[in-house]
Amino acid sequence: MILDSLKNASASFSLNPRFKKAFDYIKNNDLAKMEPGKIVLDGDNLFISLVEIDGKKPEVAKMEAHKKYIDIQIVLVGQEMMGWSAIENCKREIAPYNAENDIIFYTDKPTSYITVNPGEFAIFFTEDGHAPAISNGRIKKAIVKVLI
């Protein structure tokens, strides 16, 4: 898991060849002013889901993980807390892995929390369980899906 500011995004380019294209798009477009929806940058290899959601309380946020995609979660409006736990600590599955949606949910609780503000991002790799959307208010965010 990585937490950083968008102004430092170039430091992550070496981690995946698709990161540069994603962050270049984000830098050159005002995502906060766009309507929610899907932005395809490179087919199923790289796309952005723009969402507006009501925040959840920490006790109801579910841990999730992915096997095929890295998540880059960028807060556009509001403030979001995200839970984190190493995937090996996520043992209690709610349901089997959903390959079509590349997601599995767990009842396990995060071992750590981070706060992400507008202009900041969190990268969750396949070894990172995460509980997103923890907030007292409404959040607008971009979820960049990067095929590994």
Regions found by a protein language model. Name each.
Residues 88-90, 130, 138:
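Short, surface-exposed beta-strand-loop junctions and turns on beta-sheet-rich folds
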Residues 2-49, 60-65:
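A short, N-terminal "cap"/entry segment at the start of jelly-roll beta-barrel domains
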Residues 121-123, 138-148:
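A short hydrophobic beta-strand segment most commonly corresponding to one strand
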Residues 68-70, 74-82, 89-90, 97-103:
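Glycine- and acidic-residue-biased ligand/ion/polar-headgroup-sensing regions
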Residues 114-129:
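Conserved metal-binding segment of the jelly-roll/cupin
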Residues 60-71, 89-93, 109-110:
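A short beta-loop-beta micro-motif enriched in histidine and acidic residues
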